[in-house]
Amino acid sequence: MGIFNVFTQEIAIDLGTANTLVITNDKVVVDEPSIVAMDRTTGKVIAIGRKAQQMHGKTHENIKTIRPLKDGVIADFQAAEHMIRGMIKICLLYTSDA
């Protein structure tokens, strides 16, 4: 065991067109819809996953929802990056509480 093993954690990410899974220690810790809600004017991410899905079609015109994957392929790299970062943060919060 190296000195930096304390600071690292192995995770697996399954990017799907409908859902994205994040797995650590052989457990699914994140299972969220593959969708991002962004502010059209600022480009800021407002929500990811279930929260973004709840906003789909029901929000102000300045908020857009994006499905970053189409037919199993990344269609919007920026949105996919935001989604992955957000889901990793959720994973890290989950594992730090465990």
List each model region and its residues.
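Early-domain small/polar-rich strand-loop-helix modules and first-structured segments
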Residues: 1-82
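Phosphate/ATP-binding catalytic cores across multiple sugar-kinase/actin-like superfamilies
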Residues: 83-90
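Conserved small/polar residues in nucleotide/adenosyl-binding loops
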Residues: 94-98
